[in-house]
UniProtKB/Swiss-Prot annotation:
Keywords of the record: Acetylation, Chloroplast, Fatty acid biosynthesis, Fatty acid metabolism, Lipid biosynthesis, Lipid metabolism, Membrane, Oxidoreductase, Plastid, Plastid inner membrane, Transit peptide, Transmembrane, Transmembrane helix
Subcellular localization, as worded in the UniProt entry: Plastid, Chloroplast inner membrane
Membrane topology: Multi-pass membrane protein
Transit peptide: 1-69
Native source species: Arabidopsis thaliana (Mouse-ear cress)
Name of the top EC class for this enzyme: oxidoreductase
GO cellular component, one term: plasma membrane
Residues modified to N-acetylvaline: 70
Pfam families from the UniProt entry: FA_desaturase
Motif Histidine box-2, residue range(s) on this chain: 207-211
Protein's name according to its UniProt entry: Omega-6 fatty acid desaturase, chloroplastic
Gene that this polypeptide is encoded by: FAD6
EC numbers for this chain: 1.14.19.23
Length: 448
């Protein structure tokens, strides 16, 4: 996700926001072709079907001229100085926006600076992670059982966060950073994903592509830009996209879960047998676990003990993955312009969350070292991050989770444009962008 600094400022003024057009940088810029970050809606989420990035610009520019009142431009800064990056960081809700990584730096160059210790697997630390997740999830279920109705949202928030830790454990297993025994990793990963009704092997296969093609237009299996031709395809589709990227965006990972993991046609022939085993495990859990829950506590109990924590998990799944790689200055590039080192270092965001979230989710937010090498266990990510800050810190994007950061992502990072990175929905279809207008007015603009 190589990035360059957009040649403009995104101005926040109370509840209203403006994203000016970004003039094209000089050809000498290390990042010539910025991309965009967004997620496709419903089955279009995360590359439901292929689009052609080269055809994106024309339909976008066709609609911009009639909505000048929606996005008033401001004077574009140089964008090359530390002062300009600091201004952009402040306006986007970041602590730091990194400098352009030189073109001649490779991913191996960065990896070679990491201490060897960060790659070491420690069975006791891995077991500690499992105990933290099992204990916190059990505590969450107890809280749900004992809480009066008005405290249930807090119990659900805790339990949804705790069960996200199960996903991170399975995530380590998929990257072969949990145990030196592959069979143990497959068993633990499958079991950890079961309460989430997430098929382990299908997710593993697709997630490997995310790491191999991070922020590559079309090919990345994580959040993809909204292609302009799809945004323009029909009024119904446009409204669905706007709503999906509006109020329900923090749960849009549910669409990714449905779209990517249950269709055997999406997998290679060599993968299908393992995919079938994972699907059988998930369906068995649903066939046995769900009726058992209903038998014990009824349909409302199923909603109370399983569905609401599951929605809490998907809030974090969507939020973490959005924040990891989404910002107005982070490009999404076509394959012929993509650079691995820039994508993994410049295009990944380190974001600090409240400590209890980081503990329950096993430091999944410490994401830059994970993209330098997925083989780093979650319990070594902080040591690896410190090393990266010492050696490559000026190139990194740093943030603390805040309202302005989320407001930027949810109200600005929408439609792909090669020149501007993102074009917000309300610049293209202001009359249909009421959900975005609502978010601009309703979401606070705080950074603290």
């Amino acid at each position: 996700m190589a990035s360059r600094i957009a040649d403009s400022l995104f101005a926040f003024t109370g509840p209203q926001q403006c994203l000016p057009r970004v003039p094209k940088l000089a050809a000498s810029s290390a990042r010539v072709s910025p991309g965009v970050y967004a997620v496709k809606p419903i089955d279009l989420l995360l590359k439901g079907r292929t689009h052609r990035s080269r055809r994106c610009v024309a339909p976008v520019k066709r609609r911009i001229g009639c909505i000048k009142a929606v996005a008033a431009p401001v004077a574009p800064p140089s964008a090359d100085s530390a002062e300009d990056r600091e201004q952009l960081a402040e306006s986007y809700g970041f602590r730091q926006i990194g400098e352009d990584l030189p073109e001649n730096v490779t991913l191996k160059d960065i990896m070679d600076t990491l201490p060897k210790e960060v790659f070491e697997i420690d069975d006791l630390k891995a077991l500690k992670s499992v105990l933290i997740s099992v204990t916190s999830y059990t505590l969450g279920l107890f809280m749900i059982a004992k809480s009066p109705w008005y405290l249930l949202p807090l119990a659900w928030a805790w339990t949804g966060t705790a069960i996200t830790g199960f996903f991170v454990i399975g995530h380590d297993c998929a990257h072969k950073s949990f145990s030196k025994n592959k069979l143990v990793e497959d068993i633990v990963g499958t079991l950890a994903f079961l309460p989430l009704v997430y098929p382990y092997e299908p997710w593993r296969f697709k997630h490997d592509r995310h790491h191999a093609k991070t922020n590559m237009l079309v090919h990345d299996t994580a959040w993809q830009p909204v292609p302009p031709e799809e945004f323009e395809s029909s009024p119904v589709m446009r409204k669905a996209i706007i709503f999906g990227y509006g109020p329900i965006r923090p749960w849009l990972s549910i669409a990714h879960w449905v779209n990517w993991h249950f269709n055997l046609k999406k997998f290679r022939a060599s993968e299908v047998n393992r995919v079938k085993i994972s699907l059988a495990c998930v369906f068995a859990f649903m066939a046995v676990g769900w009726p058992l829950i209903v038998y014990k506590v009824g349909i409302l109990g199923w909603v109370k003990f399983w569905l609401m924590p599951w929605l809490g998990y998907h809030f974090w799944m969507s939020t973490f993955t959005m924040v990891h790689h989404t910002a107005p200055h982070i490009p999404f590039k076509p394959a012929d312009e993509w650079n691995a080192a820039q994508a993994q270092l410049n295009g990944t965001v380190h974001c600090d969350y409240p400590s209890w979230i980081e503990i329950l989710c096993h430091d999944i937010n410490v994401h830059i070292p994970h993209h330098i090498s997925p083989r780093i266990p979650s319990y070594n990510l902080r040591a690896a991050h410190e090393s990266i800050q010492e050696n490559w810190g000026k190139y990194t994007n740093l943030a603390t989770w805040n309202w302005r950061l989320m407001k930027t992502i949810m109200t600005v990072c929408h439609v792909y444009d090669k020149e501007e990175n993102y074009i917000p929905f309300d610049r293209l279809a202001p009359e249909e962008s009421q959900p975005i207008t609502f978010l601009k007015k309703a979401m606070p603009n705080y950074t603290a």
